[in-house]
């Protein structure tokens, strides 16, 4: 297997989580703005 795969996968997972959190905050702000 590829030794760096788990570390890359973890980094990708962290990036996805951060993006989701940002989207949730933006949507929440828009909903509160409405």
Curated annotation (Swiss-Prot):
Question: Which organism does this sequence originate in?
Answer: Canis lupus familiaris (Dog)
Give the Pfam families listed for this entry. SP_C-Propep
What is the official name of this protein in its record? Surfactant protein C
Q: One cellular component GO annotation, for this chain's record? A: extracellular region
Q: Where in the cell is it found?
A: Secreted, Extracellular space, Surface film
Query: What GO biological process terms are annotated to this protein in UniProt?
Result: respiratory gaseous exchange by respiratory system
Q: Which InterPro entries match?
A: Surfactant_protein_propep
What keywords were assigned to this record? Gaseous exchange, Lipoprotein, Palmitate, Secreted, Surface film
């Amino acid at each position: 297997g590829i030794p760096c795969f788990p570390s890359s996968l973890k980094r990708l997972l962290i990036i996805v989580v951060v993006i989701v959190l940002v989207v949730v905050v933006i949507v929440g702000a828009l909903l509160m703005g409405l």
